[in-house]
Amino acid sequence: KDYPAAILLLQKRWEDANGNVYAKRIGTMVTYYYHSTDWKNNATYEIMYGDITNRPEYKSHMMRLQVTESYTVNSKGESVPIHEVAWGDENDVPTHMCLQFTSSHGGAYIGSPGNTLWIDNVKLVY
């Protein structure tokens, strides 16, 4: 079975002297759509902040740290992996937001062909 997803991660990133990039996870929002739906106007989704592992909504297979391997360009101009190493706390301020919409779980070449996900007028509410 295949399904689309909406994912938002808030991270606080830093770079060491060797150009390695690290991040704390400050906020997490992961929504999978397990069934076909009609068009939804003004849909909103909660961002969970800090260490969410004890929350009832937490699902480790889709919300754990380093759930996917993501890359960034460091200060040396090199493409390097982002090492998500810890959960943030109430004192951490995010430096980066990762927002992903995918029509097929697992990305290209893994999901089912023919899936469609329409996204229109995305906005942040804070």
Locate each region found by the language model:
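One-face residue pattern on beta-strands with alternating periodicity enriched for small/polar residues
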Residues: 5-9, 42-46, 98-100
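Extracellular-facing segments of soluble proteins and assemblies that are Gly/Ser/Thr-biased and enriched
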Residues: 1-20
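Extracellular carbohydrate recognition
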Residues: 73-78, 84-93, 104-126
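Short beta-strand segments enriched in hydrophobic/aromatic residues
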Residues: 10-12, 49, 101-103, 126
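Extracellular carbohydrate recognition and processing domains
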Residues: 17-90
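Short, surface-exposed beta-strand/loop "edge" segments at domain boundaries and coil↔beta transitions
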Residues: 15-24, 105-112
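Residues that flank catalytic or metal-binding motifs in active/ligand-binding sites
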Residues: 2-6, 41, 113-118
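Generic "edge-of-domain/loop-turn" microfeature
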Residues: 15, 52-54, 106, 124
